[in-house]
A protein has these predicted regions:
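Membrane-interface helix termini and inter-helical loops of multi-pass transporters
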Residues: 13-24, 108
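Long, intrinsically disordered, low-complexity Ser/Thr/Pro-rich regulatory/activation regions
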Residues: 192-204
Length: 204
């Protein structure tokens, strides 16, 4: 499905752009640009979809399955409605199709990612900072200045908090930039005791 989508985007670019760019850059530079663009484009589209899941009532009906967890564990990530899984899968296919087709169209060659153990190098570094603990009761916050750029495990735990004051904040997955630009960023205090799930009215 991803290959078909990539081919469709590539053919569309051929149809709407009358000339084929001839950008001569070294393979290393193209790989670096592609890795960076995929990391950023993938993350901003995740923010947009996550924002919609919280603010569009019919989508919240699916996403609240994830937020109904009263205890966070690494398995909470799998507590997801099948429709939400489908939405994020389609998002991923679209992101990769657009970027891969655009880079092949612009540079006339295949593209590769810079990876560590098969993972985008940006995500690998983020995982080293403890991102896999976001769905846990291990409260890890970063320095305040860093939490303006990266979402810490504590910030995501605030996102899951049952406290109405925390609802609708920290919608970012990796980068906190989108939350900062859209007014949904919440810096995590150094120490805070949290309850999760719903208290009375369902949170958004």
């Amino acid at each position: 499905s991803s290959t078909v989508a990539t081919f469709a985007v590539f053919e569309w670019l051929h149809a709407v752009i009358p000339f084929r760019p001839s950008l001569e850059l070294s393979p290393a530079v193209v790989m670096t640009l592609f890795t960076l663009c995929l990391f950023i484009f993938d993350d901003v589209t995740k923010y947009i979809v996550h924002w919609m899941l919280h603010n569009v009532p019919c989508l919240w009906a699916f996403h609240k399955v994830h937020h109904s967890a009263v205890s966070l564990t690494p398995l909470t990530i799998f507590r997801t409605h099948p429709i939400e899984i489908l939405i994020f899968s389609l998002r991923s296919i679209a992101v990769r199709a657009v970027l891969i087709a655009s880079f092949i169209f612009a540079f006339g060659k295949g593209v590769d990612l810079i990876t560590v153990l098969g993972v985008n190098v940006g995500l690998f570094i983020f995982h080293l900072l403890g991102s896999n603990l976001r769905h846990s009761h291990i409260y890890i916050s970063y320095w305040a200045w860093l939490e303006k750029w990266l979402i810490s495990p504590a910030q995501h735990q605030l996102h899951h908090s049952a406290d109405p004051n925390h609802h609708g904040n920290n919608l970012g997955i990796t980068l906190a930039v989108w939350d900062r630009l859209c007014g949904t960023l919440l810096i995590a205090p150094e120490n805070l005791s949290l309850s999760f799930g719903f208290l009375g009215e369902e949170q958004k």
